[in-house]
Each structure stands twice: as structure tokens, then as C-alpha cells.
Amino acid sequence: MPLTKYKAAAVTSEPCWFDLTAGVQKTIDFINEAGAAGCKLVAFPEVWIPGYPYWMWKVNYQQSLPLLKKYRENSLPIDSEEFRKIRRAARDNQIHVSLGFSEIDHATCYLTQTLIDPTGEVINHRRKIKPTHVEKLVYGDGAGDTFKSVTQTELGRLGQLNCWENMNPFLKALNVSEGEQIHIAAWPVYPGKETLNYPDPATNVAEPASDLVTPAYAIETGTWTLAPFQRLSKEGLKINTPEGIEPETDPSTYNGHARIYRPDGSLYAKPDKDFDGLMFVDIDLNECQLTKALADFSGHYMRPDLIRLLVDTRRKELVTEADPHGGITSYSTRQRLGLDVLLDSDVQKQKKSGASDLGATNALAY
């Protein structure tokens, strides 16, 4: 039986821009802080490591190149000692960690979310299915075996989505169908509505994300919904501005947008503009009971005989090979990245020391 009452936290803070090492350490610091506060769950924003590349919305191709190169150099591989440090922090604090980061795999970056359990194991590894608009400059698409979200945990059925995935009706329907109870709506860094210039639609500023999309997710799914958000400082504005361009001087429009909502869509918590840190919530899963009794879109309030969703979780390979028995060789992304190997197992230790044989190395290599 899952816990029905527990403490959780959502991060609203400034990332360590373009700095993988510092970003990993800041992540561990927040995990330690949440653990010391008695939290069972801590949730980080979208691509918290090494920060959301908001510059891609404001620069041309040539201006983007130095920033893009540095961003890729500081993105986080899954099968790395840096990521294992974060997993160990989850284990040390006996806490679930929902972590958003720029994952680099081969030569492609992905908008990745992982759910790490209190033993340090990765129980959900997902990639944003479609980067939004100019995000395609930086990131690739998730695959069939990396987009599902909802995971059964001791905290209940927990799901996580990135940014505008939270307003995708098909992903929302999929999560509802799997009985989601707690949702992480991970957001990047966004300017406020005062920056809006016609014809840019209001979809593209922070307030609709914080105050329309996120509570709509909560009320439509009947879930506790935590919305961690990144922040910006004056120094962060400078770091994210290409050379030769005058940086913005007022970061306040980017701050104060994190939220936590109850299962009925009512606001539980929002930060002050100058708040940087953890937002806490006392979750009671029984608050989902009446919201779902009124509108359970995966059960008594749906008509699957009339409306159904087709989901394909197969990975589509660029190259397929025949196996010795005449079938098609296939693999899962999870297996290729070594996520099926227990944290600090003998296989991982051998790999770290270089003592593993070639076959074991190839099985876990990128």
C-alpha cells in the first residue's frame, strides 16, 4: 500500500548555467535539504542541468553557435559518474527525485526527466516527445520507449511531463488512463506577460503556464500537481546573452512562477518574486478521492467504446539487424544506457575502473 500522507518539495531556483559540475552539486544540495526536511519527494524544473537555454528564443543562428557548443559540453550523460552521484544522494536521503536535465546520448541532446527512487534506482526515464518550436535547435525527439510517465511508487502513482507537454491532451489522457495521483509539471524559465509583444501569443509567457495550464492539469486529472520553475538573476542574464549583444537588466519578470496545486485545481503555494529554494507541500492522497469520484476520465466518466487513444511504445530503430534465429534484434534505450544495472553494482564498478571486458563495456556504452 502506498503512503497516503507525506511531505514533498518543488525547486524554484537558478540553475548553474553551462556548468555541469556545479549543477550536479547544487542538485545534491537540494536533495540533501529536502531529505533533512523530511520530504519523500523533491521535484526539479525542466532541464535543470545545465539550465534551460532560453537564449535560443532570442538569437540568430550564428549567435547561437558558441552557446550551443558550451551547452552540449555541459549536458549530462545518463551512464556517467555525475549522474550516479545524484542517484547516491537520493539513496542517502531515502527520497524520490524527479530530475529534469539535458541528457546527451551519442550526439543528440534530449529534454529528459528521470524518477529516482529511495534506493537510487531509476524507475522512470523519459524524454520530451517533441521539442517546442526553436528548442529543435538544441534537442531531439523522444522515442517510443522513452515517453511514458506514470510510475507506481510507494508514494502513489507518480507522473512527470516537461513544459508544454502539460497541455498536450493526448499525454494528459495517457497519464489519466494510468491512474496518476501526483504529477510533476516541470517548467523551464519564462518571462512574464509584461514582456509580451504582438503578434507573439500569450501562450508563450509564464503566467498561462503557471496559472492556467498547471491548475487545469490538476483539475482535469484530479492529481496533486507540483510545478517547479527555474529563475534568473542579472548575472544569469549576462551568461545567457551572446557576445556583442546588450543583455537585459531586469530579471524579475522571469521569477516567481513556480506553483503547487491541489487535486481540485486550487492553489496550495506560490513563491514571492525574490524567493529561491524549496517550496514544501503536505500531500494527502485522499484529497484525490472526491475529485476523481466526480470526474474520473480513466473510468466511470469516460466512454472508451466511443473514444480511445492509440499508444505505441516500441522503439523505431535507425538500423535493424537479423538475429541468429531469423528474427529482428532489438534493444531498449533503458538497457543500452545501463539503467537496468543496479547502482554501484560490480558491473558498474568494473566499468569505472576499466576492468570490464569488451562485451560488458559494449553492452553499456553509448
Swiss-Prot record:
Heme found in the keyword field: no
BP terms from Gene Ontology: cyanide catabolic process
Domain of life per record: Eukaryota
A molecular-function term among this protein's GO annotations: nitrilase activity
InterPro entries noted in UniProt: C-N_Hydrolase, C-N_Hydrolase_sf, CN_hydrolase, Nitrilase/CN_hydratase_CS, Nitrilases_CHs
Active-site residues annotated for this sequence: E46, K128, C163
Keywords: Hydrolase, Lyase
Residue intervals of the CN hydrolase domain: 6-285
Induction: By cyanide.
Catalytic activity field: formamide = hydrogen cyanide + H2O
Quaternary data: Oligomer of dimers, forming left-handed helical fibers.
Recorded family membership: Belongs to the carbon-nitrogen hydrolase superfamily. Nitrilase family.
Protein task: Catalyzes the hydration of cyanide to formamide. Degradation of cyanide may be important for plant pathogenic fungi in infection of cyanogenic plants. Can also transform some nitriles like 2-cyanopyridine and fumaronitrile.
Identification of the protein by name: Cyanide hydratase
Species: Pyrenophora teres f. teres (strain 0-1) (Barley net blotch fungus)
Source taxonomy: Eukaryota, Fungi, Dikarya, Ascomycota, Pezizomycotina
Gene giving rise to this polypeptide: chy
